Amino acid sequence: MRMWLGYTLALLAGLHGSNVEGTNEVEKTRKRFEKAFSCKLSDEEVEIIRKSLVEVSGLETRILLPLIFHDRKLVASPVAKYRDINEREREYVEKVVRLLPYLAWRSVALVCAPGNWTLFLMYDVFKTTSFKDFDPVVLYRESKGRSRMRLMDLVVEIFKRNNCMVSRFGQGLAREAEVRIQGISSSLSAMERKREEEMLRKIKEHGERLCTKKNQEQIIEAQKIMCDACEYIWKREENRKSFVMGAHLKHLYLRMIDPSNDVEGPLLYYIDHEKMINTYEKYKSISIVAELVKKVVIEYEDINDESISSAVHEVKERESEEKRREEESLRNAEELLRMEEREKGEGKGPNGKGKKKRGKKGAGKAKEESKEEDRGEEEEESVEAEVPVEEMAAEGARPKKKRSKERSKGEDSCYRVHKRVLRWMKSVERIKYELDNGKEEKWKGKSMEEIEGQKVLHDIIEVLKLLRSRECDKFFVRTGKYMKGGSERWKMVALGILDEGGEKKVGNVEVGLFKGKREESVVYHLMFKPTSSEKTGKGSSPSFGKGDDVDEIEEDGSSDMSGFQYPPGVRSEVVKDKGEFRIVWRNPKDTSSVLRSLAVLQIPEIQ
């Protein structure tokens, strides 16, 4: 929550330049966030808002992510050239590209301080810099031959052009901060004067750093490395979906906070330039930096010693596994070649002629019977029972007949459901009883109010209908498998929007699975995890990360849910429309009244 609050506050200040001093502004901002998140902010979170509004923020280094979204579609990837962009989206992309010089400048110069004088200076430096000979749209559209510019190339070029403003801005910051230090009012208390001077000295030091050649080179180098890392990620299809989903989740979040912004420009991310550059120079590996970028975009991690060490370990582990598979594939190919050579040798008689194979008596008849059996099996396998929505959960958990062509997906096309998932379908009182008497310490002692809030997030068993459908892969991304508590586990993650009484939350739909004793897939975790909400529980793991907060799972605690029926009067319906799978829960006493709905969003279409 801390990272998201800080990021959004800085972004909103940079977009609107509003005066954010005073208790009233803290209260207004608190209400704005609570309305967007549909939850009460903690005292710690309110303090983050207060500090962000009345103290300096934005001194951290940032980068720009070379992706452009529009209406839940990715319309320009890092490697997209102008001709690659869908003609219907070109006008919108051009609109974003025209904003790139300012967006790139904001990523470098956005500093928020009481009175907004830092923002005014940022605007003034940008407006008084001549760009009359530079049109980013023309540069992007009219580059020719092999040198046709990709979006990532355009972003780096814009950062290079913007670099001429950095020294002037840094000098202005340092100079104005010194003037304000000298003019601190003597009417302030000693504590207030000290706090004011410390804040201004931080700004002055930041301005002086911006004037150094080393810092200016780092700005460009860090952005270039970032773009190269994005290109590396984009080339690996197994990373592409989760990368796009992680970025799109942030877009949805920001549009919920600030729906007035009609341009979905490239995202800003707080990344330590020096650590990123040092990591690249130390390991000479863009794959390690790409792993770090994935952690920032997908898992919301910062670049620090721990995340760097984790990235190095994961890349080495992946490369070792890839090498092992390549060697195994080579051995299999060599063995196959030797077998073919032996068969050729054995197939020749003393005169070098092949031996004639005789068929067995009755072989033709047996073959015909076998064909008839195969046809019968195929017909039987193609039968799929239609069930009412109220019994969907049972159908979703019970293995169903599959067409023979779909057997390759058999591992994930049917599921058993663990009792820790089923318990959330019960009454709040019963759930509390089971949690208080269960083995998971984190759930013990929860209040009825807390459990009621968690039930809203966890009681989404209807998602199983989507999991077992042929469209599942259009919505969910499968994460890598890992071992924990003696079981092989993995996750499936989708984007979602939960609407409860008109209050919307954006987040991830998480499905946790493990391999059961009979090699079946068992769902042991199912929930909607709102972005930036303490309702999910402190210390909860990121949706796309390996690992979870469930230590041990009782393997015999799963069910196929045969015979399950919803409690009397409860109604839910599933609607598929325009790239989303929507579950609607209605009031049992008045089915015209919607209690809540969950829209599972299709993975952003890549144009």
Curated annotation (Swiss-Prot):
UniProt biased composition (Basic and acidic residues): 313-347, 365-374
Origin superkingdom: Eukaryota
Region (Disordered): 312-410, 531-570
Bias type Basic residues, positions: 353-364
InterPro entries membership: DUF3654, UPF0329
Acidic residues biased stretches: 375-393, 549-558
Ranges of compositional bias, category Polar residues: 531-543
A matching Pfam family: DUF3654
Family: Belongs to the UPF0329 family.
Protein name per the record: UPF0329 protein ECU06_1610
Organism: Encephalitozoon cuniculi (strain GB-M1) (Microsporidian parasite)
